């Protein structure tokens, strides 16, 4: 019985992480949870991001992002900055779902 409760508690703790990484791009920097800069090359990125067409495609904090229409639907609000030095997170948009991943795990907490 104790085992059942333990598993239930663990499942509840990790449940939010299993949902889609729903992202909304805000208009102003002060509205954002994370400031993002898009780099030109994979090797410069902290995170390789794949833009998922459907929220069911995106999972957890693995770089599979689904951009939502409304701010209230988002897990994270991001702002695209003009300069690399202003960013909390450097991303590269990859055309391949299989390539989506963290290159700098130290910044992974930004998207939880």
Identify the role of each PLM range.
Residues 1-15:
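Sec-dependent N-terminal signal peptides
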Residues 19-112:
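Repetitive, compositionally biased segments used for assembly/scaffolding
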């Amino acid at each position: 019985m104790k085992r059942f409760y333990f598993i239930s508690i663990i499942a509840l703790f990790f449940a939010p992480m299993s949902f889609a990484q729903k992202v909304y791009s805000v208009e102003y920097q002060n509205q954002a949870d994370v400031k993002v800069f898009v780099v030109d090359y994979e090797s410069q990125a902290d995170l390789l991001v794949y833009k998922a067409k459907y929220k069911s495609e995106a999972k957890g904090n693995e770089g599979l992002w689904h951009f939502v229409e409304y701010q209230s639907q988002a897990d994270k609000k991001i702002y695209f900055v003009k300069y690399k030095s202003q960013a909390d997170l450097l991303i590269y948009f990859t055309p391949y779902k299989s390539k989506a991943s963290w290159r700098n795990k130290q910044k992974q907490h930004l998207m939880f």
